[in-house]
């Protein structure tokens, strides 16, 4: 698949930009919020976010919500994005669930909705296993469907050297490039070094 022509965004993409300037409140009883803005002349983004963390039944639960209003100066390319997530930490396991939405255009010519769940498990100080599954569609294009599943392992070779191996399987159908369900897979290997 080619991202520029085959799909607009992966289901797990939250579409919340990094603000150029932001304010993060101190935590108040587990609640905090963020305000941010990026001004690029004719294009600007306004970002809001909130987070609440609590401990319950032996687990740490975090609720997250963020919005990003993108004004490009052009009615057809303005964007409105939101991301809602729940993160549950239980022992060595972390479960993340999210729903991401992105509307494009003032009259909304594209309405992407993605949902997914991911799990990570710390096996030892050197090994972490991950897996996730997500699906996405476009409320303005009923022919568009995308699923993405992946598994991975991270291995700390030595302090400062981490090897990551991931494998993804994707299935795509849209109204132009792939009118029938088409599958693809990829495996990537990365070595991260920090000093």
Where are these regions (language model features)?
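Outer-membrane beta-barrel proteins
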Residues: 1-195
């Amino acid at each position: 698949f080619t991202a520029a022509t085959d799909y607009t965004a992966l289901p797990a993409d939250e579409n919340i930009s990094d603000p150029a300037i932001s304010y993060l409140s101190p935590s108040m009883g587990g609640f905090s919020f963020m305000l941010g803005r990026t001004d690029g002349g004719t294009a600007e983004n306004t970002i809001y976010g909130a987070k609440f963390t609590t401990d319950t039944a032996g687990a740490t639960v975090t609720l997250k919500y963020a919005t990003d209003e993108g004004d490009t100066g052009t009615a057809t390319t303005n964007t409105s994005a939101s991301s809602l997530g729940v993160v549950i930490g239980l022992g060595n396991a972390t479960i993340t669930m999210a729903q991401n939405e992105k509307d494009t255009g003032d009259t909304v010519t594209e309405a992407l909705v993605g949902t997914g769940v991911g799990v990570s498990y710390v096996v030892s100080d050197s090994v972490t296993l991950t897996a996730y599954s997500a699906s996405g569609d476009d409320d303005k294009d009923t022919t568009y469907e995308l699923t993405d599943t992946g598994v991975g392992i991270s291995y700390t070779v030595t302090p400062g050297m981490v090897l990551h191996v991931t494998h993804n399987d994707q299935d795509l159908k849209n109204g132009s490039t792939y009118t029938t369900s088409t599958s693809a897979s990829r495996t990537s290997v990365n070595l991260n070094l920090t000093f």
